[in-house]
Amino acid sequence: MNELKHLAVVMDGNRRWARAKGFLAKLGYSQGVKTMQKLMEVCMEENISNLSLFAFSTENWKRPKDEIDFIFELLDRCLDEALEKFEKNNVRLRAIGDLSRLEDKVREKITLVEEKTKHCDALCVNLAISYGARDEIIRAAKRVIEKKLELNEENLTQNLDLPLDVDLMLRVGNAKRLSNFLLWQCSYAEIYFSETLFPSLTKREFKRIIKEFRNRERTFGK
């Protein structure tokens, strides 16, 4: 049985879920947050130590301003809730991505939650904000060069935002692509594609996907 330590999820389909039900996109994102909370619960129940969530990509900056503003308003509320609940539930928050593009108040709140939860070890939630895998790799290479280290696989890995291999990449929303998420870390990850839109995912389906992964045969290229 495969051990699942690091689950990465591309949370796609929030807008399509809302449109299909005749709602504004905002409601899709709000429902997506509820699904994200269910996923965190499943990870703790299944002893998964790292959960990486693709919240906002570098490409998402091209979306309409009012949509971007709402996403960050929602993020702000989520961070407030994280301040209240994460430490109590022994959950750590770690933000990855080009955070320099965020407003100061958002960065400050992220730092506050990261600092308050850095000792928590039941689950680490790696929240990808303003994130793109190619951008992460370029920034990691620059760090290696600035430190005057040899540019090799080990040094590049250690200078990534998240130097942790992914075991299972879950892509939801009926799209079969990686969307520039954790490409380096997914070198030998198993991939599961789900047709379900993210807001519609249930704990039962999450657990079924995890069970299917644990029964796969992993060869790591051998």
From Swiss-Prot:
Keywords: Magnesium, Metal-binding, Transferase. Substrate binds at G13, N14, R15, R16, W17, S57, T58, E59, W61, R63, R171, R177, L178, S179. It is an enzyme of class 2 (transferase). The active site is at D12, N60 (proton acceptor). Gene3D superfamilies: Decaprenyl diphosphate synthase-like. InterPro entries: UPP_synth-like, UPP_synth-like_CS, UPP_synth-like_sf. GO terms for biological process: polyprenol biosynthetic process. Its EC number is 2.5.1.-. Catalyzes the condensation of isopentenyl diphosphate (IPP) with allylic pyrophosphates generating different type of terpenoids. This is Isoprenyl transferase. The gene is uppS.
